[in-house]
Amino acid sequence: MLAMTLISCCLAGPALAQDEPVVFGGGFIADDHFAYAGALIPLPGAQPDQGWAVRPVASAGAYDYRRNSADIEADFINLELSLVNRRSGDWGYLNLAAGARYSNTDLSRPDPQNRREGGQWDGMVSIDGARYAGAWRVGGYASYAFSIEDYYIRGEATRAVRPNGLRLGLETIIEGDPSYDRQSLGALVAFQPMTGTEVRVSVGGRKGDDDTEPYLAIGLSRSF
């Protein structure tokens, strides 16, 4: 089972945002897998990295799990739309968001304990931001969906090692709902191949459901 799919983009996108849209996308591969794409679109009257914006996101993927000695496979799609209040300065940035998500999860066999089964709407809130301190950057993202009680918390610390925006660091993730929980720890590389574009790659391990597995995550954001 997966928490919200807004992972790498939520930390990379706002930092690059101007008074023009930012587009982002990426994917996550472990025993489960998913891909996402979205945009951060400033509303009229917004200043660079300040004011109101909307953030649509679409994602899809698959996962499997075990329930009462039975293996269950799931395919899902998520459509999200949030209203975002952006604040920024030399200190870093902070985004506060609230919105709605439509999700549709198809299970290979019925599971009454899986709240995600079928199509449903849910309200959600999130916060993300970063603090700059010289070559160091400490950032985080947290979200919560009310109906399925889904939570996702991600933190990272990176240090710039090259003038072209190359940063190295660590990330940690905690996610779950009443039926599962997972914890991840990985190494992170972020770089800017061109002005306004950032690529992020993280590799690590994830523990949950009495097993441990490796994961790979890739994110891309581009401001215009």
Residue ranges and their predicted role:
Residues 150-183:
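Intrinsically disordered, low-complexity segments enriched in Gly and acidic/Ser/Thr residues
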Residues 19-31, 37-44, 86, 99-103, ...:
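Outer-membrane beta-barrel proteins and related beta-barrel translocases across Gram-negative bacteria
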Residues 14-68, 215, 222-224:
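Short glycine/proline- and aromatic-enriched beta-strand/turn motifs that initiate or cap beta-hairpins
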Residues 1-20, 91, 224:
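Cleavable N-terminal export/targeting peptides
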Residues 16-20, 43-53, 88-94, 132-137, ...:
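Short loop/turn motifs that connect adjacent beta-strands in outer-membrane beta-barrel proteins
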Residues 30, 53-150, 170-174, 203-205, ...:
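Outer-membrane pore/translocation modules
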Residues 123, 187-191, 211-224:
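Outer-membrane beta-barrel "beta-signal"
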Residues 41-43, 85-87, 127-131, 144, ...:
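Residue-level signature of outer-membrane beta-barrel architecture
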